[in-house]
Amino acid sequence: MAKYVIGSAWPYVQTVPHLGNLIGSVLSADVYARYLRFRGHDVVFVSGSDMHGTPIEVEAIQLGVDPEEYAKKMHQIVAELFKRWDISFDLYTHTHSDTHIKFVQNFFLKIYNNGYIFTKEEEVPYCPRDKIYLPDRFIIGKCPYCGYERARGDQCENCGRLLDPKQLIEPRCAICGSRPEWRITKHWYLDLRKLEDRIRKYVEENPHLPPNAKEMSLGMLKEGLKPRAITRDNKWGIPAPFPGAEGKTIYVWFEAVLGYISAVVELFREDAGKWERYWKDPETKIVFFVGKDNIPFHVIILPALLLANGEGYTLPTTTASTEYLLYEGDKFSKSRRWGIWIDEALQLMPPDYWRFILIYIRPENRDTSFTWALALEIINKIMNDDVGNYINRVLTFIKNRMGGVVPPPGAPTREDEEFINRVIQLFKKAEKHYDAIELKDALHTVVEIAREGNRYLNARAPWELLRRDIEVANAVMYRAYWSLKTIAAGLTPVTPRSAAELWKMLGISQPSWDEAYKPPTPGTPLGDVRPLFRKFTEEEVKDMLKKLEELRSQRASKKYPWEQVLL
């Protein structure tokens, strides 16, 4: 049994996540965590709401509300939505907890005392109209690398490059649109130059990093790591703990990534020191799930912080980074109301349908697009015709024609043995894909088992065999039933509710991954059999989209984001 810390990128809670945010981090992490637990591993799965930083502060200023009130209300909503999506966090917390604040301040003081932090005066943008400094998302402009018109002061969300506000072309205040002036202020910097060689070694020698994470990180290292300011002039955030840093806060990205540690500290707060058995054990496997725009902070910044701290933290095993999920071929956009957000999705279909669809099209190696035409095809042809139909064919036949209990192994032919051997080989292939965090390929392989099963039933025709050779019919249905155990196991991480129903139908009360490898027990009574999934028509989809627009219109008049969420 191995020990794992699984973390999904902490969502900003200025709004609820959309489907692209979900598949890029939280849902993918949940599927992997569920798989590992099902295999019997020791898993701690944590995340939380990113409460600080400019997105919240900008929105709060524009609405005339206190940032803390705003963030806490949105945190409660997002936490509830994740429960409704069946996300199996061991702890979903937030970055304004006492545990996190104290941990971050102590962590950075240690880095400061180790000599990796220095101070420097610099010119920073200031809005004379709003009378505030403009760090990060308070300032926008054209990206100097890709030309994107709304790049932020800390990062371009289009190309993913980390930026400095001075690099922006035609910068302007994100609140009022005014051109900023530049003022001298003092900030505290993490000297990444001192850590560059060790970071390069970590990236180059890490066999687990996906190609996009390795390529982006090596590109940054090739350019040379520059010192990064870790303080801001924001009012909303964690107060910087350094001598003379009164009025400064820790830059949100430098403190949020430490949440993966502070969340484990909080989880085990009743057992002092237990968290160290996860984060300071070199045998622990630490895996993060992020979208590709978060790669620099998880593959460069967090390892740098852990090394600079020097207290024996285990470096992350890998960062499972996806490409982008598009909606009908275009990027999700709140302002253009383009896409589907996770509260809206649950008004349209149960979570297992969404979970299956999103994992089936997970953007592992390239950007992929959610389209309703594709969603219908996945639901109707794959979930129903391939998987659901095969399950129903096997179980209703055993229920109606074989007394409702698992038949004996019978007298198998070579064809029957070849079938179950093929099923086990496919299941092993799915297992390897899950182990490699190739979740899409794992699910596709589970579907292939069902397709093999449908072909097998058509070829063997047990309804005919039953009339002339009961032993051969038993052999066929015994192995068909066995194949359903592999499907149930393979679906358990992806569609937990449906998989739980399938295990009940199979008459198995204590399911496990290894159960799929075990020959069935003859005489096991089946549970109640019913169709696992249902089909949707094009008309139903049209009705869903119409309902979605009606719900959005009703919410458009609401002033505050927490009033606009569908619960």
Curated annotation (Swiss-Prot):
What is the name of this protein? Answer: Methionine--tRNA ligase
Source organism per UniProt = Pyrobaculum islandicum (strain DSM 4184 / JCM 9189 / GEO3)
Q: Which residues of this UniProt protein bind Zn(2+)?
A: 143, 146, 156, 159
Q: Which Pfam families match?
A: Anticodon_3, tRNA-synt_1g
Where's the motif 'HIGH' region?
11-21
What keywords does the record list, in alphabetical order? Aminoacyl-tRNA synthetase, ATP-binding, Cytoplasm, Ligase, Metal-binding, Nucleotide-binding, Protein biosynthesis, Zinc
- Could you tell me what this protein does? Is required not only for elongation of protein synthesis but also for the initiation of all mRNA translation through initiator tRNA(fMet) aminoacylation.
Co-factor(s): Zn(2+)
Which chemical reaction does it catalyze? tRNA(Met) + L-methionine + ATP = L-methionyl-tRNA(Met) + AMP + diphosphate
Enumerate the subcellular locations listed in this protein's record, separating them with semicolons. Cytoplasm
Q: Quick one: which gene encodes this?
A: metG
Q: Which GO terms describe its cellular component?
A: aminoacyl-tRNA synthetase multienzyme complex; cytosol
GO: which molecular function terms? ATP binding; metal ion binding; methionine-tRNA ligase activity
For binding ATP, which residues are annotated in this chain's numbering?
A: 334
Motif 'KMSKS' region, per the record, lies over: 331-335
EC number of the protein: 6.1.1.10
Q: Which GO terms describe its biological process?
A: methionyl-tRNA aminoacylation
Residues spanning the membrane: none
Q: Does the keyword Zinc apply?
A: yes
Cofactor annotation remark: Binds 1 zinc ion per subunit.
The UniProt family comment states:
Belongs to the class-I aminoacyl-tRNA synthetase family. MetG type 1 subfamily.
